[in-house]
């Protein structure tokens, strides 16, 4: 397996269950040929911590965005906040986590209002 280099394109490393052992998590993925990871940002408050860990560990990159279940947090200034975050840090490699999620939520209008500007940034 050492000849194969893996990239995890969607992970969540700053959730509470990793807070105490992030360094151990890094050692485990390194030992399993995972060369890069992209943490999918769910809300704006995660961005400073994502920036910090991505600069601590060379393998970690991240996206900036707002998960559809957090769409109520979208504000008129949100698009410029995401744009600035993406432009300021070379470790940002995507916009998201974005989309529509009607499984747990009925805020369809809010989700669409948050989705469109994020898609514009990603384009």
Residue ranges: model-predicted function:
Residues 1-123:
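Mid-domain alpha/beta scaffold segments of enzyme catalytic cores
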């Amino acid at each position: 397996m050492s000849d194969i280099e893996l990239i995890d394109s969607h992970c969540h490393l700053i959730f509470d269950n990793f807070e105490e052992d992030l360094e151990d998590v890094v050692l485990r993925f390194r030992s399993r040929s995972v060369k890069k990871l992209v943490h999918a940002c769910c809300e704006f408050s995660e961005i400073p911590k994502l920036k910090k860990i991505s600069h601590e560990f060379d393998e970690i990159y991240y996206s900036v965005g707002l998960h559809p279940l957090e769409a109520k947090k979208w504000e008129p200034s949100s698009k410029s906040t995401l744009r600035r975050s993406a432009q300021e840090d070379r470790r940002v490699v995507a916009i998201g986590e974005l989309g529509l999620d009607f499984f747990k939520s009925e805020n369809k209008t809010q989700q669409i209002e948050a989705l469109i500007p994020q898609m514009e940034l990603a384009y």
